[in-house]
Amino acid sequence: MVQDSIITGIASVVESRDNSTGGHINRTSAVVKILAKKLMNSQEVVLERDFLDTVIKVAPMHDLGKVAIDDVVLRKPGKFTEEEYAKMKSHSAEGARVIQKVLAEVDDEDMTRAAVNVAHFHHERWDGRGYPEGLKEEQIPVEARIMALADVFDALVSKRCYKEAFGFDRAFSIIEEGLGTQFDPVLGKLFLECRPELERLYIEMEEK
């Protein structure tokens, strides 16, 4: 399908720009898939299967806005200055803008909306202290709340230019501590229940 080709192309562009996060897009997409499958069978959160399939499909586009960030900022190993942090934060709104243009000719409003929301709002926080809009709780589109869990978890358990990888125990503890503040508490609880599958995913990826 045309949509699939576009998404694959976008993901490749982002990965080529930000190789310091090596494999982040593939890993977060796999995490989203695991959580989405959990949600498909959940009684606590009722979401349409077609919607969750769409979220899985658009997950690779969440960091598209990073193509507009200078390499010096994108790959900086140390702490950002205020100006650099502001530039880095701009990737979410920029990604949403680019996706809107790229998918303008694709006849799938649901996919476009989900892709824009995932890119724009995956750094929002449940308590309203995220960016770029400072949305809180259910003001944040659910697809972005799902993406936020995958994005942060992968950042925790992966080595970055500014940190070593955290172990599973520490990473899951940080996610648990963030329920109701950084993360949707219900989605977060279901995410924690996916721990066996998530650990298996990362162990298998490490072995490849």
Model region roles, listed by residue range:
Residues 4-208:
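Histidine- and acidic-residue-rich, metal-dependent catalytic cores
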